[in-house]
Amino acid sequence: MAAKDVKFGSEARAKMLRGVNILADAVKVTLGPKGRNVVLDKSFGAPSITKDGVSVAREIELEDKFENMGAQMVKEVASKANDVAGDGTTTATLLAQSIVNEGLKAVAAGMNPMDLKRGIDQAVIKAVKELKKLSVPCSDSKAITQVGTISANADETVGSLISEAMDKVGNDGVITVEEGTGLEDELDVVKGMQFDRGYLSPYFINKPETGNIELENPYILMVDKKISNIRDILSLLESVAKSGKPLLIIAEDLEGEALATLVVNSMRGIVKIAAVKAPGFGDRRKAMLQDISILTFLYNSDVISEELAMDLDKTTLEDLGQAKGVVITKDHTIIVGSGKKEIFKQILIRQQLIESTSDYDKEKLNERLAKLSGGVAVLKVGAATEVEMKEKKARVEDALHATRAAVEEGVVAGGGVALVRVAEKISRLKGQNEDQNVGIRVAVRSMEAPLRQIVANSGEEPSVVTNNVKDGVGNYGYNAATDQYGDMIKFGILDPTKVTRSALQYAASVAGLMITTECMVTDSPKEDKSSDMPSPSAGGMGGMGGMGGMM
């Protein structure tokens, strides 16, 4: 077992605090409308430029192991805030730094660290309740646009696109962010269900100008096994041909004689037909096929399955689903349709979401729910260079997370004003003893830190602006972008309640633990023994010289 390096008391806390401050100082320069960028060196490729707090925090590793422990604990605050709310990482880091700095001063003055932590926790619990009272619902497009704009660093185009996307696919709809090919940001909305499976044969293409397959009001056959024998579906094909409607086959695979026969029939115009592989694998494939069946009016039966003792060769038109339309490219299939059973299915999936503990399962359930709810929207980010593209994409993703959080729990006045108002309301809170009262005051003072940093980053005097804001009431605050005082809601400066709440809770949680630290243990640095070894060049040269003499 490797030897350990152990530090105690004020020496340990001083090292830890230095690490906290190095990381937080790097992150907090990005806060507010006049916050600056941070350039991150990469081991390969061009450096990346970001204004995202968690991206900066993740890059920081310090050489001193004790300092690094402090930095990593604050990094955990940013990561947790990012995972839960998707934004507010800089605010969370700044709050943690402020609580740790104020708290360690109190510890150095002789306060009981455990009572300090209890006081901080008590203040945060009360502050969260007050935040919820200040919160107002965020349901209209204007508020969603404002939240997106603020989170995207005052980019109104991004805010408008996010609002439009949520309007088209619903609050539960899937909205993804991708790198575009042009200079302008674009929104592409896909109604219905899309999955990553393209056509099995290019000979099915009926729109050569686009290279796609388009079917109007098609029948849909869903099978959870391979189809290789054409006899299994021959009678069904005859019935479909008589109906005059197209047919889409979704199966585990379609091969050999069956695929060849379908291609020939399609090319001769006997029946309009297309085939794709079923999406997903295992249990997820079954779930997705069931979702498609709901989307396509499939009432009389479920997916054709051997588990249900259903024979493919006995399938009739009544066993098929129907859709309004289908578009198939070489990579994707889009099915547009809606069934009356959708609402019931959505309720079932929502229940599974509540019960699920796996992040992966929750992500996939959310995708399924979105496809039944309205569709998929793709935000394509435009930029002139790859470096700008990466920076902008990160901002758009932050803005998207912020708007989702706003819809979920509402919004409060932005620019650090909500925390200042909450601090005023809990300033008279009392603990069980004086040390707890000091902890409460530490938390209250720290809640001013985001406003102070926004002002500092805009080049103004933090104390003057903070006092002016504290003299006001309600949503009265400071607009750092225009250097004006007024109603933050009317200025369109909003913060999602969930983001502010998460930042405060996670900052206090980790900072409280750091304040109560008395000992730090890490591996001792390994000594470099290479300097003690004899230089190989001396002996080698001597040998060479000797050999030269012999020759």
From Swiss-Prot:
It is an enzyme of class 5 (isomerase). Residues 523-551 are annotated as: Disordered. Its EC number is 5.6.1.7. Residues 539-551 have a biased composition (Gly residues). It is found in: Cytoplasm. Pfam families: Cpn60_TCP1. Keywords: ATP-binding, Chaperone, Cytoplasm, Isomerase, Nucleotide-binding. GO terms for molecular function: ATP binding; ATP-dependent protein folding chaperone; isomerase activity; unfolded protein binding. PROSITE patterns: CHAPERONINS_CPN60. One of its GO terms (cellular component) is cytoplasm. InterPro entries: Chaperonin_Cpn60_CS, Cpn60/GroEL, Cpn60/GroEL/TCP-1, GroEL-like_apical_dom_sf, GROEL-like_equatorial_sf, TCP-1-like_intermed_sf. ATP binds at residues 30-33, 51, 87-91, 415, 479-481, 495. GO terms for biological process: protein refolding. Forms a cylinder of 14 subunits composed of two heptameric rings stacked back-to-back. Interacts with the co-chaperonin GroES. Belongs to the chaperonin (HSP60) family. Together with its co-chaperonin GroES, plays an essential role in assisting protein folding. The GroEL-GroES system forms a nano-cage that allows encapsulation of the non-native substrate proteins and provides a physical environment optimized to promote and accelerate protein folding. This is Chaperonin GroEL. It comes from Buchnera aphidicola subsp. Chaetophorus leucomelas. The lineage of its organism: Bacteria, Pseudomonadati, Pseudomonadota, Gammaproteobacteria, Enterobacterales.
